[in-house]
Amino acid sequence: MFKFFISSDAATEQTERFTRLNAHVPDLVRSVGVDVQGLDVQAMQQMNLISAECLFTPAAFAQALSHVSLWGNVAQHQTAAHVFAGNAVLCANFEAESTRILASLPQDWDFVLWGNTPGATLQLDILPDLALFTGAVQPPYSARGAAALSEMDVTSLAFPLMSTQSVCGYAISPSGADKLIKACLPLTSTTVPAANPHEGGAPAQTLEQLMSLHYSTIKAYACVPPLCMADAAVPAL
């Protein structure tokens, strides 16, 4: 499987940090992604990639389309891939453990969340058809932060993923890419529920929020504990 990480040309320090912290993972390929400065929203609307009602910021548009372009690559070439944000830190045994996890899943899996931003809530079908779990991995208490994960071996379990509005690293299959492209495009500010049900909902402002609406309808999974984690000291793009 290809392993892509998204990092813009302007983020040279981020790219250097990513490659240094994740040097233990072979064959990582940088994906430049969509440039915020060169983003033509009107042209994207004409291509039916963005709706007129979408409230995303230019940076959120660029980040979303960077992921969507990789999904298109996966769907076109019918080859699953890993995709990471430019601030992701992968565990020391990511290669072996991710391979083991994928081999343990049904062959028709669509999406596997390796990790997200510490503190972000996720909901899992932890006892399928019986009980849900809602929680969050708290920010690292190590002085080194998420960087310490790069030297840590992790043994994980995959559970059906119901929702999360944060994505740091994931595997996506051709069927998953096709389903998410159809579900999330054109980008629009559909109302998404708040993490606290009592707070109602708000218009989506990121691709991750749109993706969260559809995990429960596809064969999506999340790993606990996570195999990667967002480095809070570094922005995603």
Per-segment meaning from a language model:
Residues M1-F84, A88-L237:
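An acidic/histidine-cluster motif and surrounding catalytic segment
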